[in-house]
Amino acid sequence: MLQPKRTKFRKQMTGHNRGLALRGSKVSFGEFALKSVARGRLTARQIESARRALTRHVKRGGKIWIRVFPDKPVTKKPLEVRMGKGKGNVEYWVAQIQPGKVLYEIEGVTEELAREAFALAAAKLPLATSFVKRTVM
């Protein structure tokens, strides 16, 4: 699963997930893309699960790009531990997603196949998504 090789600090503050995705909102690599229309957090497991659904459906055809990376650690205290005594240990990693962020891209397949594959992948994700095509200027 995806996670940073090394970070400057082990733990991060929770923070806020506000605003719209200004970067990573255009289809840059592939022909078709799955774009987020809601805000939320994607865990490394969810990203991997959707990637597997995509690759299984397109089989050997096409190339897939993952445009998000889980770089924020989420901590959790062990079960039945009293409050206090410091912050818990890192449990998993998440990517913070704003509306308009491109999550996955694909090329080398038909539009119909891409739509089917992205529908399967979107079912694995906790966010509302939409199918977008690359616009040629």
UniProtKB/Swiss-Prot annotation:
Pfam family, one: Ribosomal_L16
Keywords: Ribonucleoprotein, Ribosomal protein, RNA-binding, rRNA-binding, tRNA-binding
Ranges annotated as spanning the membrane: none
Top-level taxon: Bacteria
UniProt-listed Gene3D superfamilies: Ribosomal protein L10e/L16
GO CC annotation terms, alphabetical: cytosolic large ribosomal subunit
One example of a Gene Ontology biological process annotation: translation
Gene Ontology molecular function: rRNA binding; structural constituent of ribosome; tRNA binding
Homology family: Belongs to the universal ribosomal protein uL16 family.
Assembly behavior: Part of the 50S ribosomal subunit.
Record's function text: Binds 23S rRNA and is also seen to make contacts with the A and possibly P site tRNAs.
Protein name per the record: Large ribosomal subunit protein uL16
